[in-house]
UniProtKB/Swiss-Prot annotation:
Protein name: Elongation factor Tu
The UniProt record lists the keyword Nucleotide-binding: yes
InterPro entries the UniProt entry points to: EF-Tu_GTP-bd, EF-Tu_GTPase, EFTu-like_2, EFTU_2, G_TR_CS, P-loop_NTPase, Small_GTP-bd, T_Tr_GTP-bd_dom
HAMAP family: EF_Tu_B
Name of encoding gene: tuf
Subcellular location(s) of the protein: Cytoplasm
EC number: 3.6.5.3
Lineage of producing organism: Bacteria, Bacillati, Actinomycetota, Actinomycetes, Mycobacteriales
Recorded GO CC terms: cytosol
Region ranges (G1): 19-26
């Protein structure tokens, strides 16, 4: 069957759900797709909760691990929606997920109010540069007391303000479950939530004019056709039959040609900044490429191993380290989609760095990473995020 072409008629916005485990992120995502499919059937299809929640581990522990992508349209926009993991163990995915958002819907259960992971996700959203957050106050059908709801709203606004988000952001009262069940009143609230997204999440400033760059998130082999790499285009545009380079992580760059571009199971002639897509690469084997590398316009970018960065070290309360670190500290530096070990050199006169400190540091990575000034990274020890920073200067 020939694949339908993806139409580029409306502004395209990447959005996602974040928040504490069991507050209803995935149910909210499912409710949005259902309500929009009912309201604009010619534009949308509904995704069932189970389809969004389809990570195998998910079934055993009731925690979202993999990132699910769904798409939907309002009258004004086309949205690609990631359902971001809600459990502290899966912050690694949260980082890759949150990095793909032009705005986020923070789901907070009115029955609980903000919880530790609510705070953690807002902090992470700030670190990885999610520009705007609005709030879906979920499970409102279960709270009769207006005062409780007002109290929760105040707490949420304080939390947003703490991380420099808009404390006057819309807080929409929803019941995702009731909306999924077809309750008209609550379906109306989901439409109000989407109206709030249309009105408040700014049209993303796309980086279309810069040379092409796409970090590799995943790699697949398609029998008889070759190797496909998937990811979100960070910059530039790409046409079918363009030559590209794959750089970073490995010693040598790999040259190849893009023989096909796919988005949401539809074929495209081109891809541009902001698109989540798959690139079919000529003559490339599965083992020639790995997550963490980037696909770029030939000659436009170079991988580096030494840089200076400005870093915020998470406090103990934020889930960071409990003890200071010293010169020659060797954590993992998380760039875009992967961890690379690096050795930290502290500035002269700085003997140690305490949790909660800001510090400028020089870093030498054990593998090269395609970077330029302003690129954000997280510092991690195993699965725990202990710092967040941005590259301030390339040394080598």
């Amino acid at each position: 069957m020939a694949k339908a072409k993806f139409e580029r008629t409306k502004p395209h916005v990447n959005i996602g759900t974040i928040g504490h485990v069991d507050h209803g992120k995935t149910t909210t995502t499912a409710a949005i797709t259902k309500v929009l499919a009912d309201a604009y059937p010619e534009l949308n299809e509904a995704f069932a909760f189970d389809a969004i929640d389809k990570a195998p581990e998910e079934k055993e522990r009731g925690i979202t691990i993999n990132i699910s992508h769904v798409e939907y349209q309002t009258e004004k926009r086309h949205y690609a929606h990631v359902d971001a993991p809600g459990h502290a163990d899966y912050i690694k995915n949260m980082i890759t997920g949150a990095a793909q958002m032009d705005g986020a819907i923070l789901v907070v259960a009115a029955t609980d109010g903000p919880m530790p992971q609510t705070r953690e996700h807002v902090l992470l959203a700030r670190q990885v540069g999610v520009p705007y957050i609005l709030v879906a106050l979920n499970k409102c059908d279960m709270v009769d007391d207006e005062e409780i709801i007002e109290l929760v709203e105040m707490e949420v606004r304080e939390l947003l303000a703490e991380q420099d988000y808009d404390e006057d952001a819309p807080i929409v009262h929803i019941s995702a479950l009731k909306a999924l069940e077809g309750d008209e009143k609550w379906a109306g609230q989901i439409l109000e939530l989407m109206q709030a997204c249309d009105d408040n999440i700014p049209d993303p400033v796309r980086e279309t004019d810069k040379p092409f760059l796409m970090p590799i998130e995943d790699i697949f082999t398609i029998t008889g056709r070759g190797t496909v790499v998937t990811g979100r285009v960070e910059r530039g545009t790409l046409n079918v039959n363009d030559d590209v380079e794959i750089i970073g992580i490995k010693e040598k760059a790999t040259q190849t040609t893009v023989t096909g571009i796919e988005m949401f199971r539809k074929l495209l002639d081109s891809a541009e900044a902001g698109d989540n897509c798959g690139l079919l690469l000529r003559g490339i084997k599965r083992e020639d490429v790995e997550r963490g590398q980037v696909v770029v316009k030939p000659g436009a970018y170079t991988p580096h191993t030494e840089f200076e960065g400005s870093v915020y070290v998470l406090s103990k309360d934020e889930g960071g380290r409990h003890t200071p670190f010293f010169d020659n500290y060797r954590p993992q530096f998380y760039f875009r989609t992967t961890d690379v070990t690096g050795v930290v050199k502290l500035p002269e006169g700085v003997e140690m760095v305490m949790p909660g400190d800001n510090v400028d540091m020089s870093v030498t990575l054990i593998q090269p990473v395609a970077m330029d000034e302003g690129l954000r990274f997280a510092i991690r020890e195993g699965s725990r995020t202990v710092g967040a920073g941005r590259v301030t200067k390339i040394i080598k």
